[in-house]
A protein has these predicted regions:
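Iron-sulfur cluster-binding electron-transfer modules in prokaryotic oxidoreductases
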Residues: 1-247
Length: 247
């Protein structure tokens, strides 16, 4: 178990593996946001995998082991915040079944019921809809599959709309998937590229400077694809950076 002696923590911060491995600097804006709202976040850099990719590959035993590890370490009464809707949506949907034989039903219920994507936590747990942040750019918000289906929420758009200087662009008709399932992309490269092309080409028509999302995995796929296109002048930015921005 983790050592919770010392500071009086108020929230657990769970950083998913795709942020820890490919976007480690992205943790700081999240920590800063939580601290600005008066929270004292507990963050353990060794706890970085929800097990989603293993379950998608059919590796049930590993998925169960990782889910139980999260349940065990977050059994401390504090809410759990994750800056990516795919991971938190996965935990809410699958943790109960994966940990049904864990022998700690109360701890499992805590993870399922008291886990939040970052924007959801800010709006619905802290009851804050305006962070007094500034981001003087035109931004497209990509609502990923996890944000539409697994973890439906408009909280990200609420916070973006209340960002000073930000011109928000959305597309309710966009129902495309970014293929943020690593196993699918690995075995279906051409189809993945085609779907990403359709997304990026559509976003390009809005003449925006940035694209953001509450789903970090999707942002990484979009960023990697955009890097292959010389005709696309589009920057990918995690939503926490926008919400923590002062310029």
């Amino acid at each position: 178990m983790f050592d919770f002696s010392g500071p009086k923590y108020t929230v657990n911060l769970f950083v998913p593996c795709h942020m820890d491995l490919f976007l480690p600097y992205g943790v700081q804006p999240v920590l800063s946001l939580l601290q600005k709202m008066g929270d004292v976040p507990y963050y353990n850099s060794e706890l970085t995998c929800c097990g989603r990719q293993f379950l998608l590959r059919g590796e049930i035993d590993t998925a169960q082991e990782l889910a139980f590890r999260l349940v065990r370490h977050f059994d401390n009464g504090y809410p759990i915040v994750c800056p990516s809707s795919d991971c938190i949506g996965y935990l809410k949907k699958y943790a109960k079944n994966l940990c049904q034989h864990s022998g700690v039903p109360a701890a499992v219920a805590h993870v399922v019921q008291d886990s939040y994507e970052l924007c959801d936590y800010i709006v619905n747990k802290k009851h804050v809809e305006c962070l007094n942040n500034t981001f003087n750019h035109k931004v497209f918000y990509f609502r990923s599959c996890s944000a539409r289906n697994i973890y439906p929420s408009d909280d990200a758009m609420t916070l973006l709309k209340n960002t000073k200087g930000l011109e928000l662009v959305t597309d309710p008709e966009m129902k495309l998937c970014c293929c943020g399932n690593g196993d699918f992309a690995l075995h279906n490269g051409e189809l993945t590229d085609l779907m990403l092309k359709k997304i990026v080409d559509r976003i390009k028509t809005f003449d925006v400077e940035f694209v953001t999302s509450s789903d970090l995995h999707c942002l990484q796929y979009l960023d990697a694809y955009i890097a292959t296109r010389n005709d696309v002048n589009l920057n990918v930015v995690p939503i926490a950076e926008i919400l923590n921005s002062e310029k």
